[in-house]
Amino acid sequence: MALAEADLPNGKTNGKASGSEETPAPVQKVDMNVAINELRVGCKVHVEKDGEDRVAEILSVQMRRGNLEFYVHYVEFNKRLDERIAATRVDLSQGVIWPEPEKPKKPLSGAAKESSKEKKKNPSKKQKLTDSAATTPGANSEDVMDLDNLQVNGTTQDPDNFNRDEEIEKLRTGGSMTQSSHEVARVRNLQRIVLGNHVIEPWYFSPYPIELTEEDEIYICDFTLCYFGSKKQFERFRSKSTLRHPPGNEIYRDEAVSFFEIDGRKQRTWCRNLCLLSKLFLDHKTLYYDVDPFLFYCMTRRDEKGHHLVGYFSKEKESAEGYNVACILTLPQYQRHGYGRLLIDFSYALSKAEGKTGSPEKPLSDLGLLSYRAYWADTIIELLMEKGKQEMTIEDIASVTAMTTTDVLHTLQTYNMLKYYKGQHIICLTDSVCEKYEKMLKKRRRKVNSELLKWKPPVFTAAQLRFAW
């Protein structure tokens, strides 16, 4: 029998101290009497999407050619599905949920005020870099760590100043699945891009010059990655440009693809253009204009016109965490053709040539995580199923594949291949694993031929690795 509050000893409630009951979450009221021109940013409305009714949050309101348009994010759906819609698709008969009023800002404490004054007097290098790039949204001031004013004397937060609501607010994420992002970065700013023979609809915001955002489509050269607002400008540029491949060293070539290595310091403009292009399809990465610390490995397809970019991954020249990939992308028009897997395979081929193990930088995008998990599983299962590989430890697998032991262990646990037998853990090839291997043999997957790799690990001096050398 359940106990009522009066039945509990010492006047205590069931699981809660008296007088400390949690405040119930506010109920969002639906306003049924709203005109279409009264809608503003933050409102949640019902929208027709592919013949179905969806709840969407308005991120932007704009008049385009005399017509009212809304840029919306569909609640509980991936941000890449955000789109600009006409006012006619909004169903006001089901009501509108207004945005919650902004919370009043709390006054800063004495210590916080002093720290804020010091930051204004001595801005860090990173803040100066961010301020100089006007078109590039940076992190909020609260999220930027000022190394010059960082306290390392072991001070801790006073428990009396702990605020439960503030701590919960830090953990919340919005439709972009990122914390403390600028509102402008939530709205996709380009409608379409023309890249070679492909017309592509971007997925996310990228800080291209603001004058380009007013165009219905922009033109991007698939060799130089330069961008133009009009077709005439683009055609004039192409008639004069002679570049027909990424501006780096070709380190790999087979019958299908080539790989080029580009140094971010030596080809700043090209690499910055590559970052702008990739940001249109990556939401989880922060874009900075400092490309000097990175090497870019670009995969291309060849035809009579030249080498066309398929995808790329970047890699830090010196990674303290042992990452072999910083950012990886296959362009949308080439996805689901095995090129993403080939990029991953090439990154591990470089790690093998270096004699190191490596892992991609976290966090990965949703598509990137799926690709890596599939690659890890197929590579490990194929290795274990080979004849003569009767006994292998996790360290042996990591050494052969150039994967970290953490990634190997995670993959073995995911496929239930770790068993406890006679006082020790063993790797067991289950029936499902064997079936997966049989299916894998039937698929014709592209692989990197290490014999065709013409590359030696680059060596950099301490001066070359320094900021802005």
From Swiss-Prot:
* Zinc fingers typed C2HC MYST-type, residue spans: 218-243
Recorded catalytic reaction(s): these are:
L-lysyl-[histone] + acetyl-CoA = N(6)-acetyl-L-lysyl-[histone] + CoA + H(+); L-lysyl-[protein] + acetyl-CoA = N(6)-acetyl-L-lysyl-[protein] + CoA + H(+); 2-hydroxyisobutanoyl-CoA + L-lysyl-[protein] = N(6)-(2-hydroxyisobutanoyl)-L-lysyl-[protein] + CoA + H(+); (2E)-butenoyl-CoA + L-lysyl-[protein] = N(6)-(2E)-butenoyl-L-lysyl-[protein] + CoA + H(+)
Ligand binding (acetyl-CoA): 326-330, 335-341, 365
Major enzyme class: transferase
The Basic residues compositionally biased stretches are: 118-127
Q: How is it modified after translation?
A: Autoacetylation at Lys-285 is required for proper function.
One of the record's GO molecular function terms: histone acetyltransferase activity
Instruction: Name the residues annotated as site: Important for catalytic activity.
Output: 327
Q: Where is the Tudor-knot domain?
A: 39-92
Stretches of the chain forming a coiled coil according to its record:
none
Give the location in the cell: Nucleus; Chromosome
- Biased-composition ranges for Polar residues? 11-21, 130-139, 150-160
Q: Oligomeric state and partners?
A: Component of the NuA4 histone acetyltransferase complex.
What does it do? Answer: Catalytic component of the NuA4 histone acetyltransferase (HAT) complex which is involved in epigenetic transcriptional activation of selected genes principally by acetylation of nucleosomal histones H4, H3, H2B, H2A and H2A variant H2A.Z. Acetylates histone H4 to form H4K5ac, H4K8ac, H4K12ac and H4K16ac, histone H3 to form H3K14ac, and histone H2A to form H2AK4ac and H2AK7ac. The NuA4 complex is involved in the DNA damage response and is required for chromosome segregation. The NuA4 complex plays a direct role in repair of DNA double-strand breaks (DSBs) through homologous recombination.
Q: What is this protein called?
A: Histone acetyltransferase ESA1
Organism, per UniProt? Yarrowia lipolytica (strain CLIB 122 / E 150) (Yeast)
